Every structure is written in C-alpha cells, then in structure tokens.
C-alpha cells in the first residue's frame, strides 16, 4: 500500500503490522491529550505542584530530554565542524532524536506555564535579568534550527525526490548544513549552561548554590559537559533499540565505537570536574551557610544515596566501560554503560530540581517529598509516545540510516519487523 514511499532497496513490515506497532504509542498520546486538556481547562490544580514545588516532574522531564537530545548538536559539531565524516552514517538519526527531544520539551512547557496563549510574553516582555529568558530564546531558536536540519531528511523521501524543486532544495540545504550545525552548537551551549546556571545562583538554597567562575556559577559548565557526555550515549541506545526491533544492522560498528569512545572520555572529564565542584561545595558553600552535608538528608525520602548513585554507579562505572576498548566492543557492556550514563544525567537533573526544593530553607520547616498526579505522568509519558511514533514513521519512510541497504544486502528476505 505504501511501497512507493519506502526508501528504495530496503524492506519494511506491512502497513497492518506497522499500525499495530503504533497503537501503544497512540495510547500514550491519548492519555497525554486528556491530561493536557484537563490542565488547560481546569488549571494546574490538576497537578501536585505548589509554592514548595513550582518545578516538578515536567521540568525534570524537560531538562532530562534536553540533555539527552544534546547528541544532535554535539554529533553535528563533530561531523561538520571537526570533520568526523564517519559520523554521517548516524547524523540523520541524531537530528531526529534532537528534534523529538526539543519539540517534546517545548510542548510540555506549553502546559507547564499554565496559560500557553500568553507564552509570547516570554519574548515580548523579556526579563533580561533572568537566565530563563536566555533559555527560552535559545531553545526556541534551536528547535527552529533542528526543524531546518530535519527538512532535507524529509525531502529525501522516495516520492518527494520525484519533484525536481524539492530535490534541488534539499540538495542545496545539505551544502550549507555546516552553518546550521555551528548555529546549533552556539545556541545549545548557552541554553544547556543557563539551565544549570539557574540553579547555581539560588543562593537561598545551599544544596544547589555554587561559586561563580567569572559571571557564571560552576553549574553552568557542568550542565553543558554532562549533556555532551550523555547525548551520544542516548543516540547509541536509540540506534541499538532500532536495530534490535528491526533485526537489522543499521550503523557500522566503527561509528558506534567512535561515539562511545568520545562519550566515555567526556564523561570521565565531567566526573573529575563534578567531584572537584562537589568537594568545593562541601568545603565552602555548605559551611558558610552554617550547615553540614548530613543536614540536607536529615529527613525525607531523598538521601545521600542519590548522589552516590549519580556519581559512582551512573558515572564512574559507565565511564570506565566506555574508555576501555575491549569492554565497549562487547555489545551488552556497551548498552549497560549507555543506560547508566543516561540514567546518571536524569538523576542529576532530578537532584537539582526536586531534591533542592524538598530541602527546607528555614530551621523550623519540614522536609518535603513529591508525588506526581496521573495527569502529570500522562503529559510526561506522551512525549515518549510522540517520540516513538515520529522516529518509527521517519525510519519507515525516510533514509534515516544511509548504509542500511549496504549493511543488510545479504539479509533482505528475512524476518518480521514492526517498522
């Protein structure tokens, strides 16, 4: 039925099986749609957000997917600026992953602000003293850049290639993609950093506050570093998941190994800076606030084990695996390392958002915990459903992996696949 739309020389499953594959993701979108409608019609009282937790599950998801989507700008930087041409075998996938992450985050923010029809106030009545203003501008601009980078991939569709104007336009866009890659690096550096800097300047909350390096708190640089360390691992996970489901080889091992190696060394470098920053915080910010480390975890469900889990289990262990060639060449160890790395960055964002707000700032105040409502989970999980749908449709109808045909030439007649 849709054979004319499928890339030439590759096999895809039947439309019926593909539709069956999309049903759970459509279900998540439906859940999210009902949740969003309730939040827009009845207000944010549908959530458990309050004056204590002005930031909650949605912001954790936002910061996590924005960090995991950093594989798009960083891989673009390596491919078009540094000249790692072997990464062209995976660059299309990273662009789509980045687009999914950023568009999903922006959609979630549209509900989070409570009155999305006033979202333009962020730009028209900009608070130039707020890091969130810079974040809003850069995220919106970078989403536009990702849309432009996604466009030539769409125009490579087999049917669209028959239209001469589309074919030439897409071809010309490819020639200037380095300009958009450089623009994306610039925009991403500042909004990734400002998301961290926003917490570093919360001086009334010693758990998050950090010393400044020139005009930026150290969290500015740590958020950038952690994003570029985890982003490539998320790209690897998405690629390996697609290979497992489609039962095809989609990307050469050399490309995956290069990304894993770079990610491992970046993660190790980030951990060195993170540990130095944490020790400086323990010796400086904490005692200057009249506190000790144990005071932050005196009560409540959030313990020091979260920091141990983030730095040791989800930091040092995957860094070691990714830096050792024999370890990362084992697919099971590679996937474990990438999972731990991505989990670590989610934990990092959770610690800075939820744990920071759960710790009282007054000696007579209590410790808090946060439990999201089903509406909050619905909107957050809808982003996952949206991402799975868009990536599945892109894989089915676009040449997402340029060497798929070459890598599977001998196996074109086998296997069932949901795409």
Regions found by a protein language model. Give the residues of each.
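N-terminal signal-anchor module of multipass membrane proteins
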Residues: 1-71, 75-78, 359, 388, ...
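Long, contiguous internal "core" modules enriched in hydrophobic/ aromatic residues
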Residues: 8-10, 15-16, 22-36, 84-86, ...
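Secondary-structure capping and boundary motifs in well-ordered enzyme cores
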Residues: 34, 50, 63-66, 92-99, ...
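Transmembrane-helix bundle segments that line or gate the permeation/cavity pathway
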Residues: 39-58, 64-162, 177-196
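Peri-membrane helix termini and adjoining interfacial loops of integral membrane proteins
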Residues: 42-46, 117-121, 202-206, 283-291, ...
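Alpha-helical transmembrane segments
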Residues: 76-77, 149-150, 319-322, 390-395
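Hydrophobic alpha-helical transmembrane segments of integral membrane proteins
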Residues: 102-117, 183-189, 268-270, 346-361, ...
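TerminUS-proximal long segments
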Residues: 330-419
């Amino acid at each position: 039925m849709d054979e004319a739309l499928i890339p030439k020389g590759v096999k895809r499953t039947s439309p019926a099986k593909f539709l069956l594959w999309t049903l759970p993701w459509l279900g998540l979108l439906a859940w999210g749609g009902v949740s969003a409608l309730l939040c827009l019609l009845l207000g944010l009282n549908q959530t458990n957000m309050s004056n204590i937790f002005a930031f909650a599950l949605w912001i954790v998801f936002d910061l996590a997917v924005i960090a995991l989507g950093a594989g798009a700008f960083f891989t673009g930087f390596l491919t078009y600026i540094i000249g790692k041409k072997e990464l062209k075998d995976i660059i299309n996938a990273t662009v789509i992953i980045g687009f999914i992450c950023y568009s999903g985050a922006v959609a979630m923010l549209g509900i989070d602000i409570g009155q999305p029809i006033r979202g333009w106030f962020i730009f028209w009545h900009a608070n130039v003293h707020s890091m969130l203003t810079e974040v809003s501008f850069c995220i919106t601009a970078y989403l536009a850049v990702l849309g432009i980078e996604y466009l030539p991939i769409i125009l490579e569709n087999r049917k669209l290639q028959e239209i001469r104007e589309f074919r030439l336009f897409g071809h010309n866009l490819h020639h200037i993609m380095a300009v958009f890659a450089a623009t994306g690096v610039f925009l991403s550096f500042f909004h990734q950093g400002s998301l961290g800097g926003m917490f570093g300047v919360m001086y009334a909350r010693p758990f998050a506050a950090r010393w400044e390096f020139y005009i930026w708190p150290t969290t500015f640089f740590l958020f950038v570093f952690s994003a570029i360390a985890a982003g490539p691992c998320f790209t690897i996970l998405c690629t390996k998941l697609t290979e497992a489901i489609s039962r095809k080889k989609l990307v050469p091992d050399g490309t995956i190994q290069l990304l894993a190696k770079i990610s491992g060394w970046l993660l190790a470098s980030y951990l060195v800076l993170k540990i130095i920053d944490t020790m400086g915080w323990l010796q400086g910010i904490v005692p200057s606030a009249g506190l000790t480390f144990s005071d932050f975890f005196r009560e409540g469900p959030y313990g020091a084990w979260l920091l141990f889990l983030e730095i040791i289990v989800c930091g040092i262990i995957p860094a070691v695996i990714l830096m050792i060639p024999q370890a990362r060449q084992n697919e099971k160890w590679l996937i474990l390392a990438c999972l731990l790395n991505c989990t670590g960055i989610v934990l990092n964002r959770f610690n800075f958002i939820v744990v920071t707000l759960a710790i009282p700032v007054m000696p007579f105040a209590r410790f808090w915990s946060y439990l999201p409502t089903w509406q909050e989970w619905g909107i957050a999980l809808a982003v996952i459903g949206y991402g799975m749908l868009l990536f599945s449709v892109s894989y089915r109808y676009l040449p997402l992996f340029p060497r798929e045909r070459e890598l599977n030439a001998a196996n074109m007649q086998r296997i069932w696949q949901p795409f």
